[in-house]
Amino acid sequence: MNLEQLYDVIVVGGGHAGTEAALAAARLGVKTLLLTHNIDLLGQMSCNPAIGGIGKGHLVKEIDALDGAMAKAADQAGIQFRILNASKGPAVRATRAQADRVLYRKAIRTQLQSQANLTIFQQAVDDLKIEGGLVTGVVTQMGLTLKARAVVLTVGTFLGGKIHVGMNQYAGGRAGDPPSIALSKSLRDLDLPVGRLKTGTPPRIDRRTIDFSQMVEQPGDTPVPVFSYLGTASDHPQQVPCHITHTTEATHDIIRNNLDKSPMYAGVIEGVGPRYCPSIEDKIVRFADKTSHQIFVEPEGLTTEEIYPNGISTSLPFEVQVQFVRTIKGFENAHITRPGYAIEYDYFDPRGLTSFLQTKAIPNLFFAGQINGTTGYEEAAAQGIIAGMNAALQIKDQELWCPRRDEAYIGVLIDDLITCGTQEPYRMFTSRAEYRLLLREDNADLRLTEKGRQLGLVGDERWESFSKKREAIESTQALLHNSWVRVHHNDLFKEALLNPMQHDCRAAEFLKRPEINYQHLLMMDDLNLPELPQEITEQIEIQNKYAGYIDRQQQEIEKLRKHENTMLPETLDYNDVVGLSSEVIQKLNRIKPTSLAQAGRISGVTPAALSLLLVHLKKSRLPV
C-alpha cells in the first residue's frame, strides 16, 4: 500500500539520534516524519541513565547551542548533577547528570509533539525504496510505502541485533524490543561496507535489597549545575545521591572461573566491544593485578526501585551474575530485577559518509548514531542534529554544513569517523580535540549559536537570550580594556593579591592574575562595572586569564586553515599523483578526502605525501 503524501524528510528511529534529527529537520521548515517501532519509547535511555561526562558534556552543550533537545530534557529529568574535573582548567570541565528515565522520555516526547512540521508514526521499517541511485522512501513492516525526498537512518543497536546471556542468544534490538532483521538485510544488499560491533549492560538491582551503609555516599554539586543555556536550577526535579562500592577478590574469582561461559571469551560474539566501557569480564582479564574495581550505584529514577550498578556490564550466564553480584560490598542480599547482557549489531563504515553524514553511494540517504560505529547517547544526538539539518538543507537546495574540528567537538567526532573510520565503538573524549581550550563547555553558544541561527536551527527565544549574553560580555570586556587599576588600589586588594602591583594596568590585564576574579573588580566603585550573572562573569574571566593561550591556538588554526581551504576534487584519481606509495593511493582513493587537511589526518598519509599532492594540484592547474 502506498501513502500518497510526500514527506521531505523521513527519520527512521526514535532514539537520541533520531529525535534530534527529526527536530532539526522540522525546525528548518521541511515536512518531517519520525518513524519509531514504539512511540512510548521515544528518547529511551537503553543503558546508563545519565547524560554528559568528559567530552560528552561538551557535545550536549553544543547540541543545546544549536537549539537541540538533549540539554533541556536532561535539566527536566536530572536527579543528580555534578561538574567533573571541577578543580582542573575550564577546557576539561564537564557537566554530568544522573537522569530519571521516565522523566527524560517525557521531556523528549513533549518537545517532539510540540514541534511544528513534525509527524510521528509508529511503524518499523523493513526496506528502502531506491530509484535512479536515490532513496525515494521506505517500506514499513506492514507493507506501507512512505515517500520521501531524503531519509535519515538512526537505528541504534537494532540492525541485525543479537542479545547474549551466557551461551544463550536470541534476536533483539535491546531487552524487550525486536531487532531490525529485514532492514539489515536490505542495507547489506546495497553493498555498503558493513561490520559488527558489540556493547553491553549490567544487571539491574532492587534498591530495597542493597545495604547502603557499606558504601560511600556521593552527593551532587551545590549549587546545582544546569545543562541548557536557557535552563535554571528550578527546572530540576528532586535531587538524590549516588553511592560508590567495589568488587572483591571473591567477585574476581567467580568471574575468572566462569570465563568459559562468557560468549565474548568463548568466541561466540564476533563484534568488538567499547574500549572505554569494558565488561567486568574484560576488566578482570585486562587488569589481572587489581584486587577490586569501583562501581557507581546509580538510581534509575524517582518512581522506581531499580538501581543501575555502573561498572559491572556483563554477558555471563544469569546464575553466575547472581553469584558474583552477591560478593560485592552492600550487594550480599541483592535481588537482580533484570539480567545483564551483551548485544551485537550491524554498523556501516563511516568512511562511506561525507562530512554532512550523507552516504557517498546514495546522496539523499543520511546515517546518524550507532549505525556509524559510535557509542553513547551524546555522540548519537550530536550526529542526529547534523544529519537532520543537512537532510533539510539538501531539500531546500541550500549549502550543507558541518562544524570544523576547531569549531566544535561535533566537528571532531564527525571528522574522526569519516576520515579514520572505527573498528570499535567510538566514544568522545576531550583528548581527541587538538584545540581543547577553544572548545569549552562554557562557550559552546558563542561558537555555534550564531551559525545555528543563520541555518534556521535556532529559535527566537534562544537567539534573544544569546544576543543579550554576548552583548553583556562584549560591552564589559570593552569597559575592562578601557579602565585602569592604579597602584594605590593595592590596599583595596591586599587580602587577595599574592604580589602587590608595581605599576598601573588596565583592568583586563589585572583580571589575568589567577587570584583575582570579577567580584574583586566590583569593589572598585570608579570602574562602574555592572553586576552580571555567574555564567557571564565566568566567560569574561576565562577570556582574559587564558587570552595568551587562546591567541596561540588561534594562530595555529590560521596556519592550518590554508590546508582546510585547499580542496581536493572528488574526481581526483590518486593513481595519477607521482611519488605516492601504493598504501597512500589506496587509502586516498577509498576515503576521497575533501581537503588537504583531511587527507593529512588519514593514517599513513605523511607530510611528504601532502607536498606531492600540492605539487600535483599546481601542475594540474587545479584550484589551490
UniProtKB/Swiss-Prot annotation:
Record-linked SUPFAM superfamilies: FAD/NAD(P)-binding domain
Main location: cytoplasm
Listed InterPro entries: FAD/NAD-bd_sf, GIDA_C_N, MnmG, MnmG-rel, MnmG-rel_CS, MnmG_C, MnmG_C_subdom, MnmG_C_subdom_sf
UniProt: NAD(+) binding residues: 273-287
Annotated positions binding FAD: 13-18, 125, 180, 370
MF (Gene Ontology): flavin adenine dinucleotide binding
Subcellular location: Cytoplasm
GO CC terms, sorted: cytosol
Cofactor entry: FAD
A biological process from GO: tRNA methylation
Keywords: Cytoplasm, FAD, Flavoprotein, NAD, tRNA processing
UniProt family annotation: Belongs to the MnmG family.
NCBIfam families reported in the protein's UniProt record: mnmG_gidA
Described purpose of this protein according to its UniProt entry: NAD-binding protein involved in the addition of a carboxymethylaminomethyl (cmnm) group at the wobble position (U34) of certain tRNAs, forming tRNA-cmnm(5)s(2)U34.
HAMAP family, A to Z: MnmG_GidA
Subunit: Homodimer. Heterotetramer of two MnmE and two MnmG subunits.
Designated name of the protein: tRNA uridine 5-carboxymethylaminomethyl modification enzyme MnmG
Phylogenetic placement of the source organism: Bacteria, Pseudomonadati, Pseudomonadota, Gammaproteobacteria, Legionellales
Gene: mnmG
